[in-house]
Amino acid sequence: MLPVYKWWQVPYFWVGIKAYDFVAGSRNLKSSYFLSKKNALELFPMLKSESLKGAIVYYDGQHNDARMNIAIALSAARYGATVANHVAVVSLRKDPETGKLIGARLKDQMTNEEWDVQAKVIINATGPFTDSIRQMSDSTQRKICQPSIGVHIVLPGYYSPSSMGLLDPATSDGRVIFFLPWEKWTIAGTTDRSCEVTHHPSPTEQDIQFILNEIRHYLSGTIDVRRGDVMSAWAGIRPLVLDPSKPNTESIARNHIIDV
């Protein structure tokens, strides 16, 4: 649900959401539609009613990313791939005559055992660690990845209906924030700021307070949004394509790049 608090937003959001439906084509789950103020509040009772004009509802999907990753690994193993968890690339190996990459040296992070593997092709799909692997081949290569940290918080389930989420496409600093029902709880997020690459990113109190403040803008004034309602919080790192002309990560387009 996209709540609308100004009449000009109705055609603005409507055109964008209908374009979303059009791109989805025959795979679209259901067509989007407009809700009156009365119906929007019936579906999302905690929504702020002051100046509310109505809401636009569109359909999207959810999936459990952790389970999906496990399913991908198991499927790959079933078709003959060797799946090596907790294994890091220590260095890339080159043919001394041609300079062509021919393999890598790996390290088991649990036992510290190291060994070499040969490869005809090396695919670097390591997300925020992309540049560290690329520079193993050539330390002079320019960076193509801008790591950005995003934080989510988990709130009690009563913060959102069991079958309806809420999206705010324009927060106080131009980002997008959402509340989504998940496993009888409510997930709210996200933040977006540049960061250093780490294996264990963690949310800051500033990140959590930002999300809570944005939530307060869209919920009824009778709802006391408390810090104590945050049941848990986590952070992840997005590997955004580096654009030197963009000062902030929230202004960087979510593009993809293939570097051969």
Regions found by a protein language model. Name each.
Residues 85-102:
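A conserved short coil-to-beta-strand element within the FAD-binding core of flavoproteins
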Residues 110-121, 125:
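Core beta-strand elements of the Rossmann-like FAD/NAD(P) dinucleotide-binding domain
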Residues 21, 41-79, 103-105, 113-117, ...:
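Helix-loop-beta segment of a Rossmann-like dinucleotide-binding subdomain
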Residues 1-43, 177:
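Dinucleotide-binding Rossmann-like beta1-alpha1 core, especially the glycine-rich loop
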Residues 82-84, 231:
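General small-molecule cofactor/ligand-binding pocket signal
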Residues 67, 75, 132-187, 193-260:
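C-terminal catalytic lobe of FAD-dependent flavoproteins
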Residues 34, 83, 116:
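Short aromatic/basic micro-patch
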